Amino acid sequence: MRHSNSGKKLGRTPSHRKALFRNLAKALLTHGKIRTTEIKAKELRRVVEPLITLALRNDLHARRQAYSVLGSHQLVKRLFDEIGPAFVGVPGGYTRVVKLGQPRRGDCAPLAIIEFTRTVAASEAAAAPAEAE
């Protein structure tokens, strides 16, 4: 029985779930908005919102905790230098999940967009590949 066990299993092993949400969190922090299934978007909030709360603390221990989740120094720098300052004074609710009307072709899965509630300053790292194309 799964009494009081929060979170969805998504038909994956714990290590697969951890890798999935780590990759989705990296994509959201990099692009600011991603399209995924509705359930994954709702579960991703449980990973990303504490990361932004860590960015608001902005101390060495918070950076190390964020690195343990993200595994990328560039993303930790972007999180603490660009994304965190955009949410100063906001008590929570850093992301929004917008349901899309059309389901995914093939398996009819309900889709959603997860994005930040505030606009985040564009980084030079994210802008450089766009200018090169």
UniProtKB/Swiss-Prot annotation:
Q: Name one GO cellular component term.
A: cytosolic large ribosomal subunit
Q: Which domain of life is it from?
A: Bacteria
Entry's Gene Ontology BP terms: translation
Q: Which UniProt keywords apply?
A: Ribonucleoprotein, Ribosomal protein
**One Pfam family from the record:** Ribosomal_L17
Q: Which Gene3D superfamilies match?
A: Ribosomal protein L17
Example GO molecular function: structural constituent of ribosome
Q: How does it assemble?
A: Part of the 50S ribosomal subunit. Contacts protein L32.
Q: Which family does it belong to?
A: Belongs to the bacterial ribosomal protein bL17 family.
The identity of this protein, by name, is Large ribosomal subunit protein bL17
Mind giving the lineage of the organism this protein is from? Bacteria, Pseudomonadati, Thermodesulfobacteriota, Desulfovibrionia, Desulfovibrionales
Gene this chain is encoded by: rplQ
